[in-house]
Amino acid sequence: MWNNFFVFILLLMSAVSCVNVPENGTIAAYSVSEDTVSVSIRGNVPVSGEWDAEWIHRYAADVDKLAERAAADSREEIDVLFFGSSSIRLWRGLEEMMAPLSVVNRGYGGATVRDILVNYDKLMAQYRPKAFVVFCDNDICGNQVDLSVSGVLDHYRLLFDRLDQDYPGVPVFFLSWKYSGLRAFMRDKQRLVNSIMADYASGSEQVTFVDVNSTLLLLDGDINPELFESDDLHINHDGYLLWTSMLKPHLMRVCER
């Protein structure tokens, strides 16, 4: 009965054993078969859910293109790997804005933290960055497969733990979820996600919360429409310049530039 479904399973234990658990009991990768996905991780992170296989792989072609692009890139050591959803993918001029840092853009449109976890190996490829930047705010956008606010935190904890296992000591910069006119009806949940993620980061040596959303707001707390594209969802060049002004000093510091 589980055909065409991907199942995310996490047992609540101090050291969890699902599939592909290393002998030392630390986090293991997602294990993907024809109709299941399982997770193994150490720690206390309860996560469960079911998603249609077609949905979880809806951007497989885009992810494959990123993998092909990485295969053609001879670099391994870079300064910063950016990944996440369309707000990363559409960051035109990222290399110039972040210069002299060497950066790689691994964003793809519509990404959620769930399919980032599934596509993790393809997204990270061969790169060994000094820092990660992630922006991905599609797990709560008003559709039937939305996560709860607590579910967003749980899945990001999975992602952060996997990064810490594979890239020990490498900092992760989490960009706050941005408000937009198109998703104004989601603002209370977006605000709560930002509050929870900021609180999480405050107790983490790995994760830094960067409140880029604040750069897009007017004094009354509403969004500045002059910083958005006509779709009322994505930011424009001026918006990215503001994000850069807030984020780049952090990256220059950790990359020792």
Regions found by a protein language model. Give the residues of each.
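Oxyanion-hole/transition-state-stabilizing segment in secreted/luminal serine hydrolases
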Residues: 88-104, 115-153, 173, 177-181
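Catalytic His-Asp segment of secreted/periplasmic serine-dependent ester chemistry enzymes
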Residues: 179-257
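Conserved beta-strand scaffold positions in the cores of enzyme catalytic domains, especially
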Residues: 82, 103-105, 209
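N-terminal secretory targeting modules
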Residues: 1-80, 96-99, 254-256
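A short helix->loop->beta-strand "cap" motif at the edges of active sites that frequently abuts
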Residues: 167-171
